[in-house]
Amino acid sequence: MRIKAALFCVALALAGFAFAAQAQDKYPDKPIRIMAPYAPGGNIDVTARIIADKLKDVLGVTVLVDNKAGASGMIGSDVIARSAPDGYNLLVSANSLVDIPVIYGNAPYDWKTAFQPISHIQAVPAVLVVTPDSPIKTLADFVRIGRETPGKLAIADSGVGTTNHIVIELLSDATGAKYTVVHYKGSGAASIDVIAGQVPAQVDQLNSAIGHIKAGKLRAIALSSDKRVPELPDVPTFKESGVKELAGFTYSTYTGLFGPAKMPPDVLAKLHDAMVKVLTDPTTVKRFADLTAEASPSTPQELAAMLDKEDSTVVPLLKKLGIKPE
């Protein structure tokens, strides 16, 4: 009798294993949700929709974008952190996944253990801009003024803790130059005042500033990217500025695709392979290029390394400066 019971348990366990394996083999067989934890229309939302549009063709299922804004992305991110790790609930996020919990505090999750990186998606550099008639011609000029007259030169950003703000603080920390940072609620409001001559300089995302630059309303000084961009071939990078402290400087807003932690390896592999197809598709590449962004897939390990670098370079600076929301 005991032998029969034992055999029954073994058979039941094998059946369960076979069922689980079969379920994973069928993945995906129902709609997938991609969380964009910010309001519609922003960089994260647009990125999520471009990905969803092509991912549905690659995977053969409906892919929906869900916007849950609030707490600078932490509310929507927490929804995914608490979801089943079955590949049907995904998250598009950025550097802010690491930075925002430090700035706002009391994050409902630990990003290091709550999420599974899947692939890098795209990156957009920041650009330092001034008015066309500004005497500041180069990044070296900008740094020199910040060193010789600390705090005299004002510079606008798009808000406390944004990538634009972080770029200013990283530059200041690296060079010892000091500026009066004027925090606006969004790039648009900042650009209006810079164009009007109310503030002499601004750090903005290239995709936000490119229209003003092309129209001649703002002049680009330098880019925070690793290399020059096709849209502005004559604009040097921070690394090319001749300022020795900036010789290795690169910092961009990057986005990535994540799932909840503990995703099955085969589901992770299917999603990663699908993302490689999506991000190397000429249509997707062009859609991102039109937004001055560079589409580039990565391995899960490479995306994890990017987050770790953010944690080791930016987070200590945020803590040192005591940056908190206004």
Which sequence ranges carry the predicted segments?
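N-terminal (or domain-start) structured segment
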Residues: 23-113, 152, 176-205, 212, ...
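Beta->alpha turn/N-cap motifs
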Residues: 92-97, 157, 167, 187, ...
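An extracytoplasmic/periplasmic, membrane-proximal ligand-sensing/linker region
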Residues: 29-31, 214, 265-326
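Bacterial N-terminal signal peptides
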Residues: 9-17
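C-terminal lobe and pocket-closing loops
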Residues: 123, 209-280, 309-312
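Sec/Tat signal peptide C-region and signal peptidase I cleavage site
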Residues: 17-23
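Hinge/capping helix and adjacent helix->loop/strand transition within the periplasmic-binding protein
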Residues: 82-88, 102-189, 238-240, 254-287
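Bacterial N-terminal signal peptides that target proteins for export
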Residues: 1-10
